[in-house]
Each structure stands twice: as C-alpha cells, then as structure tokens.
C-alpha cells in the first residue's frame, strides 16, 4: 500500500533532519522574519506585508525594475554570524562598499542582490542611531556607517556631479542629516559594538 509518504520515500529524511538540526542560528540583531526562518524554517503568518515593514518593502520591490529578479534563486534563510563575516570579507575583497557613500536606495539594492543570490531575508542590515558612527546591529557584519568629512563632501561639488548622487543629497536619507559612507572594520566580527552601546535593541534576542 504505500502512498507518497511510504517508507521508501522517507529514506533520506534522517539526513535532512540532521542537517536542519545543525543549521547555524541567526545572527544577533536580525529582524523578526529572520527569527521566524531560524525557528520555523519559513516565514510564519505573524510576519506579512501588513504586519512587517521588511515584508512590505520586499513585496513592493517585486513591482519595480531593479536590474535583476528579486525572487531568490536559493532557499530563503536568516543571516547568520558566519555568513555576515564571510559576506563582509567578500565585499571587501571585491572593493564593493569601502568608502561608498551610503543612501537608502544603495542599501536597498545591496539587500535585494544578497536576497536574490544568497537567499538572506533583507532584515539584517540595520544600524545604531546617530549622530556619529552607526554600528551594525547584526553581529558579524563588518561594515559600519561613518560620517564623511566636510573636505570630502566639498570635493564632490563639481559640474560633472549628478544632483542625485548621495553626497549631493547632503544626508537627506539620514535623520541626523549626516552624509555617511560604508567603512570596513574587521573588529566588528569579534566585538559587538551595537549590543554594548544600545542593549535595548537586543532585549528579545
């Protein structure tokens, strides 16, 4: 008799179960959806576009043309400590973020690309509030946001500069009106500055 769940079809289940058991935990500082993915292996009904800003944002991106598909080509999963460290070093080696002026749009593009290529739900790249240096809430992410010196901002003022370049926006994305740039700091892989400076963000972790 055997239906689709007969003994022969469950042969590989112990290996799958063991792999699930050994899955790395989500990194400290990730959002609610990543916590769902860690605990349940899926996004639960408590996190929908109506109840979670990250889900709503991701759903809205599916309507927009961003240059690549926004549906992940790999299984959806939470950002882990190891993945955050590895991704930080990968981007550093490729010269991707170091010294790049931060804007919400650029962060959104990065989040979508990582979501699409790696499957990490885009609720992990959050930072401490300003003014001053903004540290990543996700432990293992080695990029902080650092205010740009006025000299560097002034050097941007030329005829060939796009008015929509993030430096030209003079921090309009930022509540403190600071122009910020991504800066790699390898110490963030070992020292969770955000937890030290803002323990209130980690009460439910």
From Swiss-Prot:
A motif (Diacidic) lies at residues 173-174. The keyword Plastid does not apply. Induction: Expressed early in the viral replication cycle. GO terms for molecular function: GTP binding; SH3 domain binding. A motif (PxxP) lies at residues 72-75. Its main location: host cell. The modification Phosphoserine is found at residue 6. The record marks 20 as: Might play a role in AP-1 recruitment to the Nef-MHC-I complex. It comes from the Viruses. It is found in: Host cell membrane; Virion; Secreted; Host Golgi apparatus membrane. The virion-associated Nef proteins are cleaved by the viral protease to release the soluble C-terminal core protein. Nef is probably cleaved concomitantly with viral structural proteins on maturation of virus particles. Myristoylated. Residues 62-65 are annotated as: Acidic. Pfam families: F-protein. HIV-1 lineages are divided in three main groups, M (for Major), O (for Outlier), and N (for New, or Non-M, Non-O). The vast majority of strains found worldwide belong to the group M. Group O seems to be endemic to and largely confined to Cameroon and neighboring countries in West Central Africa, where these viruses represent a small minority of HIV-1 strains. The group N is represented by a limited number of isolates from Cameroonian persons. The group M is further subdivided in 9 clades or subtypes (A to D, F to H, J and K). HAMAP family: NEF_HIV (MF_04078). Factor of infectivity and pathogenicity, required for optimal virus replication. Alters numerous pathways of T-lymphocyte function and down-regulates immunity surface molecules in order to evade host defense and increase viral infectivity. Alters the functionality of other immunity cells, like dendritic cells, monocytes/macrophages and NK cells. This is Protein Nef. It comes from Human immunodeficiency virus type 1 group M subtype B (isolate BH8) (HIV-1).
């Amino acid at each position: 008799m055997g239906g689709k769940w007969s003994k022969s079809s469950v042969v590989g289940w112990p290996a799958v179960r063991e792999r699930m058991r050994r899955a790395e935990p989500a990194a400290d500082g990730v959002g609610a959806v990543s916590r769902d993915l860690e605990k349940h292996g899926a996004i639960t009904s408590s996190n929908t576009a109506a109840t979670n800003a990250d889900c709503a944002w991701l759903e809205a991106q599916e309507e927009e043309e961003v240059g690549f598909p926004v549906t992940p080509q790999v299984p959806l999963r939470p950002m882990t400590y190891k993945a955050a460290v590895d991704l930080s070093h990968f981007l550093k080696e490729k010269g991707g973020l170091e010294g790049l002026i931060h804007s919400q749009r650029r962060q959104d593009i990065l989040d979508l690309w990582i979501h699409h290529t790696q499957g990490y739900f885009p609720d992990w790249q959050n930072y401490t509030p300003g003014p001053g240096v903004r540290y990543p809430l996700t432990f293992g992410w080695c990029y902080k946001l650092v205010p740009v010196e006025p000299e560097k901002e002034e050097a941007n003022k030329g005829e060939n500069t796009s008015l929509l370049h993030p430096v030209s926006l003079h921090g309009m994305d930022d509540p403190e009106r600071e122009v910020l740039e991504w800066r790699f700091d390898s110490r963030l892989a070992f020292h969770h500055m955000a937890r030290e400076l803002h323990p209130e963000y980690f009460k439910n972790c």
